[in-house]
């Protein structure tokens, strides 16, 4: 399944530069690949490292943050040196390399386990429908709302900064800063999350960073340093919120099968909700011709996300 997902990423990314039709089809393939790999990630952590969920979730988030910061920070600059079509197709080499590494790991793993099979099966089947569990819906809501904030900010931050008088290249660097600033805490935050019984302190911290960050973005017209502060705080808050969401899928379940079930449901619902964010922001900007209303909308989403996160914290397990 992993090979198929990576293959979808490779093909989808490579073909989407040729026409509008290939763009739509390629984007669908990329979305399917990312969705399945995201569901797989917390399940693998829960199965392979049940006593080190925070550490390995941190490694996963760190890798995502590093690759995102490199892409966001240098895409605009590199596209001026080579065409954007070539740049996008060149990125397809990354999942190809990952496929090669996955094949090597699978071959190595088969050799080590050929003489010894696991003493117990993966885990008993989940008998209760995850769609009937309120906590699973709350987890999906938290996942979706934090993703909505992230994708909306990622999509519209450069235009917002340019509307504040910042040039395109600098806006690209600031977007890279937003991704890069979270790297030092990527390892730490999931370990903190997995080591405490209650998540309310972390959820309030994430909420506060979002609110101050969005407020600073409103002030970006008055000073360039407000823009820098906004990118730093929003980088921290989006990374911490994603770490919280991904770690909770493992912490709120007892077995890898439960994790897979909850993660699949939560991320399906969550990303469907998140997909509306950039579109709503674009619609609001077209309606009002300014970014203030968009930022107010994102602040409102932050409040709802905080409330949903506190609901998640009230129950210990989904099943």
Show which residues each predicted segment covers.
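A late C-terminal transmembrane helix in Major Facilitator Superfamily
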Residues: 251-290, 298
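Intracellular juxtamembrane helix-capping segments at the cytosolic ends
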Residues: 36-49, 240-254
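Helix-loop-helix hairpin linking two adjacent transmembrane segments in secondary transporters
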Residues: 20, 51-110
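Extracytoplasmic gate region of multi-pass secondary transporters
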Residues: 132-186
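Helix-to-loop junctions at the C-terminal end of transmembrane segments
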Residues: 185-198
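Cytoplasmic helix-loop-helix junction between adjacent transmembrane helices
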Residues: 26-62
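Juxtamembrane intracellular "pre-TM" segments in multi-pass secondary transporters
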Residues: 110-139
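Structural signature of the two symmetry-related core transmembrane helices
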Residues: 1-14, 201-216
